From Swiss-Prot:
The lineage of its organism: Eukaryota, Viridiplantae, Streptophyta, Embryophyta, Tracheophyta. It comes from Sorghum bicolor (Sorghum). PANTHER family: NADH-UBIQUINONE OXIDOREDUCTASE CHAIN 3 (PTHR11058:SF9). It comes from the Eukaryota. NDH is composed of at least 16 different subunits, 5 of which are encoded in the nucleus. This is NAD(P)H-quinone oxidoreductase subunit 3, chloroplastic. It is a multi-pass membrane protein. Belongs to the complex I subunit 3 family.
Length: 120
């Protein structure tokens, strides 16, 4: 039988952790001065007015490089718990992790051959 009262501490923590940011934003909205005018709507960068246009178009190579970085960053997140419990999990999990890394290496070789890792 599922007893809900076993999770009272969890639900209390969840409610308090949700209410604190809501209350902080609500109180700051009540106490903050309201200023309207052209200065409120002006754009600035690091405290000064921007020079030239604010919109820049990035080359697609930056996006590809960032995408490859995110893929291998997520790989690290998945492999870290596996490495910490390597001695407990056994051979089958080692084979699964090896297949996972192999798939990512194939993706890395593909990205390398397509030129996604080159800056020129």
């Amino acid at each position: 039988m599922f007893l809900l009262h076993e999770y009272d501490i969890f639900w209390t923590f969840l409610i308090i952790a949700s209410l604190i940011p809501i209350l902080v934003f609500w109180i700051s909205g009540l106490l903050a001065p309201v200023s309207e005018g052209p200065e409120k709507l002006s754009s600035y960068e690091s405290g000064i007015e921007p020079m030239g246009g604010a919109w820049l178009q990035f080359r697609i190579r930056y996006y590809m490089f960032a995408l490859v970085f995110v893929v291998f960053d997520v790989e690290t997140v998945f492999l870290y718990p596996w490495a910490m419990s390597f001695d407990v999990l056994g051979v089958s999990v080692f084979i699964e992790a090896f297949i996972f890394v192999l798939i990512l290496v194939v993706g890395l070789v593909y990205a390398w051959r397509k030129g996604a890792l080159e800056w020129s």
